[in-house]
Design a protein with these regions (language model features):
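Conserved donor NDP-sugar-binding/catalytic core segment of glycosyltransferases
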Residues: 1-11, 80
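Conserved nucleotide-sugar donor-binding catalytic segment
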Residues: 47, 54-62
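Hydrophobic residues within well-ordered alpha-helices
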Residues: 74-75
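Acidic donor-binding loop at a coil-to-helix junction in glycosyltransferase catalytic cores
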Residues: 63-70
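Terminal low-complexity segments of carbohydrate-biosynthetic enzymes
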Residues: 80, 103-130
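A recurrent flexible, glycine/aromatic-enriched loop bordering the glycosyltransferase active site
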Residues: 9-19, 23-45
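A residue-level structural signature of the nucleotidyltransferase/glycosyltransferase Rossmann-like core
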Residues: 43, 82-83
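Active-site donor/metal-binding and catalytic loop motifs
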Residues: 84-101
């Protein structure tokens, strides 16, 4: 409940609107949001057969876009993300990000750029190794 969050220190802002349980409101807000529907690891799901078809996560990648890269290959396969910002509640617990490595993020971006240019669907370094 929103009232519990407010009683326990949550500061009232626009983000609280994502917690409103109203199908019409959620549908409208998902429709008007300016963010693109993308695959993000914190709140994603797919059919197992689709994940297998793209060979899962590229295990050469690390934090900093590895989830987006999987979603981009699903997109290349013809699987499109849905915008559910206001339909599927997701709360994030703050944590330090000591594992962030700029060089690894640059590598991830390079792989994503290659995949987009060449319409890559299946990774060689995923569930099944080639």
């Amino acid at each position: 409940k929103i009232s519990w969050l407010l009683k326990n220190g949550f500061k009232l802002n626009f983000k609280v609107s994502k917690l409103i349980q109203n199908k019409l409101f959620s549908f409208f807000m998902n429709w008007v949001t300016t963010t693109k529907p993308t695959w993000n690891g914190h709140n994603s799901s797919a059919y197992k057969s689709d994940i297998i078809a793209v060979n899962g996560f590229n295990e050469l990648l690390s934090y900093g876009g590895e989830d987006r890269e999987l979603g981009e290959r699903l997109y290349n396969l013809g699987i499109f993300s849905k915008q559910i910002r206001y339909s599927a509640i997701c709360l994030h617990l703050y944590h330090e990000r000591n594992y962030v490595d700029i060089e690894k993020i640059k590598f991830n971006l390079k792989v994503r750029k290659f995949n987009k240019k060449h319409n890559v669907i299946k990774t060689k370094e995923g569930i099944y190794k080639n």
